[in-house]
């Protein structure tokens, strides 16, 4: 991945209340740790235990806390802020838009959409997606091989990465990010031991993820036995996590 950011563009992104020390004339073409940064790179101090590494860093631009007082090297710009780590996140968010742009709205010719499904004209439906009967998909992005079950709902501005499965009747809120391979709405683990054998208990509930939920790759969230397994607004779940039914 390649990019080029002027110091002026960096300052526009991180905010106009930053303080400056030193000067760097040129573009930033990389982001690296304090120890590994070279000329033309940007680095930051997010953890106080690495404070001593700032003085020896070769980075051309440094995002630092406001209380940092050491003098920058020649050709080095220090940008001092309340939260350098968050400032870096703002920069990366801007870079992501150009490095990984969202696909344009439209339906790939290999996708299958049931005649009774409703798909927003602002949605992007990727190759080999399958959208079931009665499903509703808002202005979302579905990458390749996503499956949305019968009567499921996907909210606006959500991004479903490759091979995500949304089970029947499940509800995905707005601005969700569901990473590759995660399964929302698989059966909960429900059995009764009857006459010497385990008998399956049907799981007739669903999963509801509220707004701004992130679910990591290959995570499974079980549908409820009845009612809903609810993932609250703003929840962030890592990769390879299993959420049991009715939580």
Describe the function of each predicted region.
Residues 1-110, 175, 181-182, 187-199, ...:
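Terminal amphipathic alpha-helical/low-complexity segments used for targeting or macromolecular assembly
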Residues 44, 106-247:
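Structural signal for interior beta-strand "rungs" in well-ordered beta-sheet cores
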């Amino acid at each position: 991945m390649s990019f080029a950011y002027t110091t002026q563009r960096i300052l526009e992104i991180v905010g106009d209340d930053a303080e400056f020390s030193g000067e760097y004339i040129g573009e930033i073409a990389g982001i690296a740790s304090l120890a590994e940064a070279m000329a033309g790179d940007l680095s930051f101090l997010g953890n106080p235990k690495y404070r001593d590494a700032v003085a020896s860093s070769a980075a051309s631009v440094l995002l630092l806390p406001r209380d940092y007082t050491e003098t920058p090297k020649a050709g080095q710009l220090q940008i001092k802020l309340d939260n350098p780590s968050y400032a870096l996140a703002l920069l990366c968010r801007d870079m992501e838009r150009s490095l990984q742009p969202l696909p344009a709205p439209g339906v790939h010719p290999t996708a299958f959409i049931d005649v009774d499904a409703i798909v927003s004209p602002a949605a992007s439906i990727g190759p080999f997606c399958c959208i079931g009967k009665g499903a509703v998909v808002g202005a979302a992005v579905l990458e390749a091989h996503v499956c949305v079950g019968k009567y499921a709902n996907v909210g606006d501005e959500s991004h479903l990465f490759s091979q995500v499965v949304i089970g029947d009747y499940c509800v995905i809120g707005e601005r969700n990010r569901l990473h590759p391979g995660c399964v929302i709405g698989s059966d909960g683990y429900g059995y009764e031991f009857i006459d010497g054998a385990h008998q399956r208990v049907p799981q007739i509930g669903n999963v509801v993820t509220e707004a701004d939920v992130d679910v990591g790759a290959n995570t499974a969230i079980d549908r409820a036995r009845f009612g809903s397994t609810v993932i609250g607004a703003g929840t962030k779940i890592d990769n390879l996590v299993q959420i049991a039914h009715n939580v």
